[in-house]
Regions:
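Bacterial N-terminal signal peptides that target proteins for export
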Residues: 2-13
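Hydrophobic h-region of N-terminal signal peptides that target proteins for export
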Residues: 13-22
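Aromatic-rich carbohydrate-binding modules that target alpha-glucans
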Residues: 25-65, 74-97, 140-184, 192-217
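A glycine-anchored, Pro-Gly-centered beta-turn/N-cap motif
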Residues: 65-67, 115-117, 183-185, 225-227, ...
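Short, aromatic- and glycine-rich surface loops/edge beta-strands on solvent-exposed regions
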Residues: 69-71, 189, 279-285
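Append "Rare intracellular matches occur via the same short Y/T/C beta-strand/loop motifs
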Residues: 119-121, 229-232, 278-287
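A recurrent domain-boundary module in secreted/ectodomain proteins
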Residues: 125-140, 230-249
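C-terminal outer-membrane/trafficking sorting elements
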Residues: 247-295
Length: 295
């Protein structure tokens, strides 16, 4: 009887440890003087889950050698963070450094790089490591891993967490694109889908609606006709294109039998729904878009 009890207790502990490891954090946000948003959590940089492993987070952004940075797992201070440990650590390209949680070490020491540049950053919360290397694209500083469209014209309405993702293009990651069904209404562009309305938005230039401004008065774009649109945002040239696509032949009154469903990873690549690896995905079913998490 005692052996059975101990065996069951051990199995429960192993299961609990496995669950905790598989869900080390739901999000990872970069803050610090090394990134454009500084210490503003609202403007923190969103790292994206790897489709292969939900405990691996990736970002390609500009890091300033004159500042330091660390990682938050929530949108508030005083919770679980990942930092450098006992001393600040200057990261070396392609060399793994320890990612130390606040549960292990209370010292608020941070990471830095020796040269200002765009970097590929990979954080593995299972292995507790961080690896950086210079990104292939260095033409302009990269501020965002993605952008999100919100507003009454978008599928998610004014819910920032349900914003429609604009993904960076491969050749030029300062240009972001999405194809989305819009309705009559307003929209603007968020830089962080994890925080709130205190963040800085890309907004309509009142002198030219094909131009954007970053921050300032809350001038939004107006969509006057429901339809399927290609949206392209260029954060260097500060331009936006909202172009209605050609009709696909699908009626606006969709039924279960004629709705087309597609699944995409966070890189904007279409994937099969069979044998999905753990990670975050975007499902588009007709005019509806939702986020799916596979554990």
């Amino acid at each position: 009887m005692k052996k059975n009890f101990l065996r069951k207790m051990f199995c429960s502990l192993v299961l609990a440890a496995t669950v905790l490891t598989a869900n080390a954090a739901d999000r990872l946000l970069i803050v610090g003087e090394a990134v454009w948003g500084g210490w503003s959590i609202d403007n923190s940089i969103v790292m994206l889950n790897s489709t292969e492993n939900p405990d691996v987070f990736k970002a390609t952004v500009n890091l300033n050698a004159n500042g330091t940075f660390k990682f938050l797992t929530t949108t508030d201070w005083g919770n679980l963070e990942y930092r450098a440990g006992d001393n600040d650590v200057t990261l070396t390209a392609d060399v793994a450094s320890n990612l130390v949680s606040t549960e292990e070490n209370s010292n608020d020491k941070q990471f830095k790089v020796s040269e200002t540049a765009n970097y590929d950053i990979v954080c593995d919360l299972t292995a507790k490591t961080i690896v950086v290397k210079k990104a292939g694209y260095q033409t302009s500083p990269l501020k965002h891993t993605a952008l999100w469209m919100i507003g009454s014209a978008t599928p998610g309405g004014w819910s920032i967490g349900e914003g429609t993702m604009l993904v960076p293009t491969v050749d030029n990651p300062t240009v972001f694109k999405a194809t989305v069904n819009l309705v009559e209404g307003e929209m603007k562009i968020a830089v962080n889908n994890q925080t709130g309305f205190g963040q800085t938005f890309y907004l309509r230039d009142t002198t030219d609606e094909t131009k954007m401004v970053f921050g300032g008065d809350d001038n939004k774009w107006n969509i006057t006709k429901a339809g399927k649109y290609d949206v392209t945002v260029d954060v260097v040239n500060m331009t936006i294109s909202i172009t209605e696509t050609n009709s696909s032949g699908i009626s606006s009154a969709e039924s279960a039998s004629n709705v087309s469903t597609a699944l995409y990873d966070l890189g904007g690549n279409r994937v099969s729904s069979k044998n999905l690896r753990p990670g975050c995905y975007i499902q588009k079913s007709g005019s509806k878009i939702k986020k799916i998490i596979v554990k």
